[in-house]
From Swiss-Prot:
Domain of life: Eukaryota
Any Gene Ontology biological process: regulation of DNA-templated transcription
GO cellular component: chromatin; HIR complex; nucleus
SUPFAM superfamilies named among the record's database cross-references: WD40 repeat-like (SSF50978)
PANTHER family tied to this protein: MEMBER OF THE HIR1 FAMILY OF WD-REPEAT PROTEINS, PROTEIN HIRA
Organism: Aspergillus fumigatus (strain ATCC MYA-4609 / CBS 101355 / FGSC A1100 / Af293)
Role this protein plays: Required for replication-independent chromatin assembly and for the periodic repression of histone gene transcription during the cell cycle.
Protein name: Protein hir1
């Protein structure tokens, strides 16, 4: 019983799988069966019986080096041809001819739990994929035959596998009535399962052509066309009729069906060549050197024992051969020249079908196949050969560093604490606790030295307040000690999964704003919700005519008032000189109803009135919402200087963690003297607990307050801003703005104030200066687009505006975009947008890893209380994700990208967008000075460049990292000097020894080791490795990744 046939790439051999035997035959002898000269030449070259069951599939590797076979003994065997002649004669007890070729079994691959049904090699022979009745798709390395990944995606038996000739996808067919497309990148010869963790991902699932397909077929062998455009999927149905579905690449839809077989089609096979309808000549070549009218040929067979040959230029089969065997045809294989087709059947029949020139067409040269695949960005890079021993040593160190890195991460995830392990806490090293315990955070230096005292003097550093006991940790301890009793009455302590209980922080080192998902969510919630009034518009609804003549509303329609008595009564009262009192409702105007007089104690209103807007807003192209005038405005900070919830008005201060509270009380609108301008002043008070530390008064209504341990500030309704020291001393005269303030934030000595016309002001209280002139938000809010119309239109809203510890303004918008202002370039920079969210493979890929990075260079400055710009980029990207999903924009962008991927010229779209996203992240981290994120993004970017083999970008990256590290110092002093608004080590090309806070040598060594395993890049990386001493110094520590 024959199940499988496979062809070798050199046309000289083909192989068959039978009951426990793999037989290799000579095609030359078969082609010349009628020639007397070949009568004595052997047809069977070898026979191997390494399987203990029926063999279902055999496949030659495209490079002709290996042969793979799979059987119902759950084993995949790998054979290779030995140049030495076979050492044995014919098998004892058999009548077979002695073997001519010596095929040795070099590997037995164990990974399936049931029969192996089909095998497939990638076109560059880099991977082997096996599928079976255990519903598994197992990916093996084509070089080392190590198991790279197991895909348990299908829900039933998998019975077919085919590879994309462009080496981008492979497709599997299953009895769950689906064909699934997997995207992959060819692994390097020394890749491991860890390297390929994010490789081999599901791209698409196709189910429509197979919804009612029968489950009785032995196989579902599909095939990919040689031009990469189509997949022929067996065992499809078109209504009640069996068919072969032709699936289009990119869109993955099947609108073409090959109908004619009376039973389910079990096997399809495209010819490996492209054909022309006329003999190939120079006249048949167009201006772009492409042969014209290329067609493909496909053979189909199955349970009806018939064979059909189809050609894409003909809607009907050109050949139909019936009753080819006594049982179902199980497999088909074309010769590499496309002139012969081999078939096997379940009754043991082996068929060879020869075609004369012109019957199918005229085969094109293989170069034409390559030309047709170039539009898909074919990835046929060879294994590569290490040219020097330095390259091999660099490759070995790269792999050793990756293994140690994996072990370190796994140990951290499992909560392994070591006495020698250290983590960074506020720039200082602290022992890393074990069992997931969280180290107590030391007090901030600012909290020790700048706490305000009643007499205005600085106090001595106080001991940090003890952390409150974690209730989850206490509950966890109780659960650990909970006893259980066995049937015989013995007491046992029940085991507990420690990592899944409680809410204690991880033992991994954390960066600010990236401690955990819960802390990130809490950090994004504003400390208080400000009741905002509607933005002021220069013209009322209805335009200029409404401004001049008014825009009168109609009275609401009342039940029982069809004759309009209410409207007539209002009109009559107006004629008599009276002013009717009407209530403005959504349905229209209604006569006002008398209200009973209020009795008892009245609650203090949350807001008193809307703020009076500045007349300049009438001509401004940008108008932001202005906060209403509230009766009480409170800002509270804890002992570490962080904003916190103020004490509640119910008199329960014990629930608040506030250390100092800054309060502004606006007076009631009532006048003291009868004149409207003679009102009570605003009272500002700083409290610690119940004790007031200092008090001040302002003659203007306060809209916003902010503050920290360095200063306190209040913004007033007339656009003036006041600043006090922690002791209550006014640091500057009132700062006057052009409009009302709408946002007031602070961070350390920096204050950010945004006015109602979109002007951003940044001040440094310590130096009484500003890093740049006032900047407008119009570029950020797309003012250039929204002001093109005749009337003002709605623009994206500001959902968050913050300032970092370097005075950099960061703005998040309601359309999902995030911006930061660059003081060195005097312009806004777009850090995050929805385009990356739907187009990049790296979206949402940094939140956990960033917290896992430890400092690899010199210790941070002891005065640094937190990492500069830490978490800003993930914060903006989270806002992009939330806003995009909230507004449904992601659905339309995904549809756009899906359409683009199916169009010609966009085959490398996803890869290009992913690399561009990493470059945008890297540039943003460097500009903001986000040290930890920069190192992580650099590592991810280098690994992607190595996987893609982009030599030019790799060489440019290495040159940028090395900078002026090994250049001689300029003794003449004519080197480039930094401008006043520039930061050191924020430029790739400058000659500083550090880059974004990291020593350039450390970053360069990490990138070199990440790229060292790619042999096709070793001509670029080995010289840098020698320069750094990575491969020359044999006595250095083998742990090259540890710095």
């Amino acid at each position: 019983m024959e199940h499988e046939v496979g062809m070798d790439a050199d046309i000289s051999d083909f192989t068959l799988g039978a009951d426990g035997y793999v037989r290799i035959w000579s095609t030359e002898a078969i082609y010349n069966t009628g020639n007397p000269e070949y009568a004595n030449k052997p047809k069977q070259l070898a026979s191997m019986s390494n399987h203990s069951g029926t063999i279902h599939t055999v496949r030659f590797s495209p490079n002709g080096k290996y042969l793979a076979s799979g059987a119902d003994d759950k084993i995949v065997c790998i054979y290779t041809l030995d140049a030495n002649p076979p050492s044995h004669a014919s098998t004892f007890g058999s009548n077979e001819a002695p073997p001519v070729e010596n095929w040795r079994t070099i590997r037995r691959l164990i990974g399936h739990d049931n029969d192996v049904q089909d095998l497939g090699w990638s076109y560059d022979s880099s991977i082997l994929v096996s599928v079976g009745l255990d519903s598994k798709v197992v990916v093996w390395s084509g070089h080392t035959f190590e198991k790279l990944k197991t895909l348990s995606i299908h829900q039933s038996h998998v019975k077919g596998i085919t590879f994309d000739p462009a080496n981008k996808y492979f497709a599997t067919a299953s009895d769950d009535r689906t064909v699934r497309i997997f995207r992959f990148t060819s692994p390097s010869p020394n890749s491991t399962a860890h390297d390929q963790m994010n490789n081999f991902v599901l791209e698409h699932t196709i189910s429509a052509p197979f919804q009612n397909s029968p489950l009785t077929a032995y196989f579902r062998r599909c095939s990919w066309s040689p031009d990469g455009m189509h997949i022929a999927a067996a065992n499809a149905v078109n209504g009640p009729v069996s068919s072969v579905a032709i699936i289009n690449r990119g869109s993955w839809d099947g609108d073409i069906n090959l109908i004619g077989h009376e039973a389910p089609v079990e096997v399809c096979a495209f010819s490996p060549r492209l054909y022309s309808s006329q003999p190939v000549s120079k006249s048949a070549v167009d201006n772009q050197n492409h042969a014209m009218q290329n067609v493909t040929v496909i053979a189909c067979a199955g349970g009806d024992k018939s064979l059909s040959i189809w050609i894409t230029s003909n809607p009907r089969p050109i050949v139909v051969a019936q009753e080819m065997a006594a049982k179902s045809i199980s497999d088909l294989a074309w010769s590499p020249d496309g002139k012969c087709l081999f078939a096997t059947a379940l009754d043991g029949t082996i068929l060879a079908v020869r075609f004369e020139d012109g019957e199918l067409g005229y085969p094109m040269a293989m170069e034409e196949n390559e030309k047709s695949l170039t539009k898909f960005g074919t990835n046929r890079r060879g294994a590569g050969i290490a040219e020097t021993t330095d390259g091999l040593l660099l490759e070995e160190k790269s792999k050793a560093g990756e293994i140690k890195d994996v072990e370190g991460r796994m140990g951290a995830l499992m909560g392994d604490g070591h006495a020698t392990a250290e983590s960074m806490v506020n720039g200082k090293t602290a022992p890393l606790p074990s069992n997931g315990a969280t180290p107590a955070r030391g007090p901030s230096p600012a909290a020790d030295t700048q706490k305000a005292q009643p007499n205005g003097t600085a106090a001595t550093p106080a001991a940090p307040e003890p952390e409150k006991p974690d209730p989850y940790q206490a509950k966890l301890e109780r659960l650990k000690q909970r006893p259980t009793y066995t049937k015989d009455g013995k007491k046992r302590i029940a085991p507990l999964l420690v990592s899944g209980a409680g809410a204690a922080e991880s033992s991994l080192p954390q960066a600010r704003l990236m401690a955990s998902v819960s802390s990130q969510v809490k950090a994004d919630v504003p400390q208080s919700i400000v009741d905002l009034s509607k933005p002021f518009d220069g013209l009322p609804k209805g335009g200029l005519s409404a401004l001049l003549f008014g825009n009168k509303r109609k009275l609401a329609q009342l039940e029982g008032d069809e004759d309009g008595h209410v409207e007539k009564r209002v009109a009559l009262a107006s004629q008599n000189g009276a002013t009717p009192i009407l209530a403005n409702t959504p349905d229209g105007l209604l006569p006002a109803q008398p209200q009973p007089a209020p009795t008892g104690q009245q609650p203090t209103p949350e807001f008193i009135r809307p703020a009076v807007t500045n007349p300049c807003m009438a001509i401004s192209q940008l108008r932001l919402a202005v906060p209403k005038v509230r009766s009480q405005i409170v800002r509270a900070i804890d002992s570490n200087g962080r904003p916190t919830e103020p004490p509640s008005a119910t008199g329960e201060p014990g629930k608040s963690r506030a250390d100092v509270v800054f309060e502004a009380r606006n007076p009631s609108p009532a006048s003291l003297t009868g004149r409207a301008v003679d009102r009570e002043p605003v009272r500002l008070t700083l409290f610690r607990g119940e004790q007031p530390l200092w008090q001040d008064f302002l003659p203007r209504t306060v809209l916003l307050v902010t503050g920290n341990q360095s200063m306190w500030s209040a913004a007033c309704e007339d656009g003036s801003v006041y600043i006090w020291s922690p002791a209550g001393r006014r640091l500057v005269s009132a700062l006057v703005l052009e409009a009302q303030p709408v946002i007031l934030e602070c961070n350390g000595p920096w204050i950010l104030c945004i006015s109602a016309v979109g002007m951003c002001y940044v001040w440094n209280v310590k130096h009484l200066s500003s890093p740049h002139p006032p900047i407008s938000l119009q570029p950020v809010l797309d003012a250039a687009i929204h002001t093109l119309g005749a009337h003002p239109s709605a623009a994206p809203a500001i959902t968050n505006a913050r300032i970092n510890s370097e005075g950099r303004v960061v703005v998040a918008l309601s359309n999902g975009e995030g911006y930061s202002y660059s003081p060195s370039m005097y312009t806004w920079q777009r850090v995050s947008e929805a385009w990356w969210a739907v187009g990049s493979q790296y979206w949402n890929s940094t939140e956990a890893p960033v917290g896992n990075l430890q400092s690899a260079g010199p210790q941070q400055d002891k005065e640094t209380t937190a990492a500069v710009s830490a978490g800003i980029i993930p914060f903006l990207e989270r806002n992009t994700t939330n806003e995009t999903l909230l507004r449904g924009r992601a659905y339309f962008l995904q549809r756009l990208i899906k359409v683009l991927l199916s169009r010609e010229g966009y085959e490398s779209f996803e890869s290009s967008v992913s690399i561009a996203h990493m470059e945008n992240r890297l540039a943003a981290a460097l500009s903001l000075g986000a040290k930890e994120e920069f190192r992580l993004y650099l590592s991810m970017y280098a690994k992607r460049l190595g996987a893609e083999g982009l030599k030019m970008k790799v060489e440019e990256l290495l040159k940028g990292l090395i900078g002026g590290l090994f250049e001689e110092e300029d003794e003449t002093g004519t080197g480039r000097r930094l401008q006043a608004n520039e930061k050191e080590d924020r430029n790739w090309q400058e000659s500083s020894d550090t880059l974004c806070g990291w020593p350039r040598e450390v970053l360069l060594k990490e990138v070199i080791l990440a790229l060292g395993k790619h042999r096709d890049l070793q001509r670029v990386t080995v010289p840098y490795a020698k320069l750094l001493g990575v491969v020359d110094n044999e006595s250095e520590d083998n742990d090259a990744m540890e710095t």
